[in-house]
Amino acid sequence: MSQALTLARPYGRAAFAIAREGGTFAPWSDALAFSAQVAGDPRVAALLLNPALGQEQAVTLLAPPQAGEDYLCFLGVLADAQRLSLLPEVAGLYEHLRAEAEHVVKATVTSAAAMSQTELDTIAAALKKRFGRDVDITTAVDASLIGGAVIDTGDVVIDGSLKGKLARLQSSLAH
């Protein structure tokens, strides 16, 4: 486990608790995604380390225009603790906790070519049956897979790609 994730964990849990209490999961997701993207930019990361940048200015820089008072206070706490650079990890932890609370499995389906909606619906139905939860699918295309697909749910990876099958075949022949 990386040190950044360890340091970000209490902030991710705090953000989740505030959003759950206010019933504002989606706005917090949007705000954290915005702030994480901004904080993840190398130029902004360097700026955040500059002592000439005040905490209020840092919060203003990282807050989305529609941010509520709770979110601005949350960013202020991160700024006070000099943890604004952890926003990408905080956002990831928050999304994981949100998915758990909403009984949703987030899956990334990477295929060699674009998949039809029918194929994605079939995969979603199979994953829902396997995990007993709703499925939120994100797609990606990677031509190096040659054919097939790789399904990544975070905890479980199902490699049905030709590239993966060839690698397993090569490994078994080598032993």
UniProtKB/Swiss-Prot annotation:
Belongs to the ATPase delta chain family. It comes from the Bacteria. GO terms for molecular function: proton-transporting ATP synthase activity, rotational mechanism. It is found in: Cell inner membrane. Keywords: ATP synthesis, Cell inner membrane, Cell membrane, CF(1), Hydrogen ion transport, Ion transport, Membrane, Transport. One of its GO terms (cellular component) is plasma membrane. F(1)F(0) ATP synthase produces ATP from ADP in the presence of a proton or sodium gradient. F-type ATPases consist of two structural domains, F(1) containing the extramembraneous catalytic core and F(0) containing the membrane proton channel, linked together by a central stalk and a peripheral stalk. During catalysis, ATP synthesis in the catalytic domain of F(1) is coupled via a rotary mechanism of the central stalk subunits to proton translocation. PANTHER family: ATP SYNTHASE DELTA CHAIN (PTHR11910). The gene is atpH. Its main location: membrane. InterPro entries: ATP_synth_OSCP/delta_N_sf, ATPase_OSCP/dsu. This is ATP synthase subunit delta. The keyword rRNA-binding does not apply. The lineage of its organism: Bacteria, Pseudomonadati, Pseudomonadota, Gammaproteobacteria, Lysobacterales. F-type ATPases have 2 components, F(1) - the catalytic core - and F(0) - the membrane proton channel. F(1) has five subunits: alpha(3), beta(3), gamma(1), delta(1), epsilon(1). F(0) has three main subunits: a(1), b(2) and c(10-14). The alpha and beta chains form an alternating ring which encloses part of the gamma chain. F(1) is attached to F(0) by a central stalk formed by the gamma and epsilon chains, while a peripheral stalk is formed by the delta and b chains. The keyword Ion transport applies. It is a peripheral membrane protein. SUPFAM superfamilies: N-terminal domain of the delta subunit of the F1F0-ATP synthase (SSF47928).
